[in-house]
Amino acid sequence: VEDWEKLPLPIQYICCSHRRMMQAAHWNEDNYRHYVAAFQHYTRIVARQIESVLEALYSTPAGKNTIVIVLADHGDGMGSHRMVTKQVSFYEEMTNVPFIIAGPGIHPRQKPVEDLLTQPTIDLLPTLCELAGIPVPSSKPGISLAPFLKGEKQKRQHPYAASEWHSEYEVTVSPGRMIRSPRYKYTHYLEGNGEELYDMLKDKGERRNLAHDPKYSKILAEHRALLDDYIRRTQDDYRSLKVEADKRWRSHAPG
C-alpha cells in the first residue's frame, strides 16, 4: 500500500479492529495460505448444502410457489491487505457478497452476473414485491430486479452502490460509508474525516489512494456528492453519529 500514513485512521489501526485481526498481525505467509484454504473449503461445503436444499425444495409441490434468496451481510478479507474476517474496511473482499435468487419464473444462469450494479439491502424489497405480485412501496429507494431475473434486458439503473460500517462489538465506534460507482470506489470515515478513492479499473487491488491526488479532485468531489445523495435518499443519520475510538487501540504506531 502506498502512503500508508494518508489512509483513514480506522484503516491505519485496522490491526485492532477485530480480535482475529490482532492474531493475524503476527502471521507469516503459511498462516495466510492455511486461512484461505480453510475458507475456500468451508465455502464449497456451504455451496453443496445450498444445492441440496434447493433440490429437495423444488422436488416438492411447495417449490412451485417458493422463492429462495441467499444473501450475506459481509464478505471476508481472504488475506487481501493482510486482512482476515471482516472489519472496518470497504475493500472488495469485504463488500462483495453472494446474492442468489432462485424460484419459479426466474431465468437460470450458468455464470455469475457481473454487469449489474445492485444494492441487495434496498433492492430486495421491491424485487420480492414484484415477484410476488404485490405493489411496490413508492417511498422506498430500491429498484426491482424482477425483469432481469425473468430474463429480460435491464440496464444498470443505480449510479452507485453503497456500504456502511458502524462498530465491532461496540468496542470502537468508527462509522464509515462507501460509494462504489462503475469505475471508482470512494470511502469516508468520521474519525479524522478520512477518505479513500480508488480507480477500480487500473487498481483492482486498491493499493493507491487517490483522495489526496490533485489530478483526481473533480472525481473526488463527484463521489462526495454521491455520498450526500445516498444520505439524503436513505435518510441516513451518518453525519450525526459519534466516533468512540478506545485509546487502547490508538496508542501504538499505525500499521
Protein language model regions, located:
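Solvent-exposed, non-membrane alpha-helical residues enriched in polar/charged side chains
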Residues: 51-54, 58, 146, 224, ...
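Active-site-proximal cap/lid insertion segments
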Residues: 1-118, 131-139, 188-191, 206-207, ...
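Exposed, low-complexity/repetitive linear segments and helix-based recognition motifs
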Residues: 2, 200-203, 225
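A short, conserved beta-to-alpha structural element at the edge of catalytic cores
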Residues: 98, 102, 227-235
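C-terminal cap/loop subdomain of S1 sulfatases and analogous C-terminal strand-loop tails that border
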Residues: 74-80, 107, 122-125, 130-196, ...
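Charged catalytic carboxylate motif
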Residues: 45, 49, 123, 127, ...
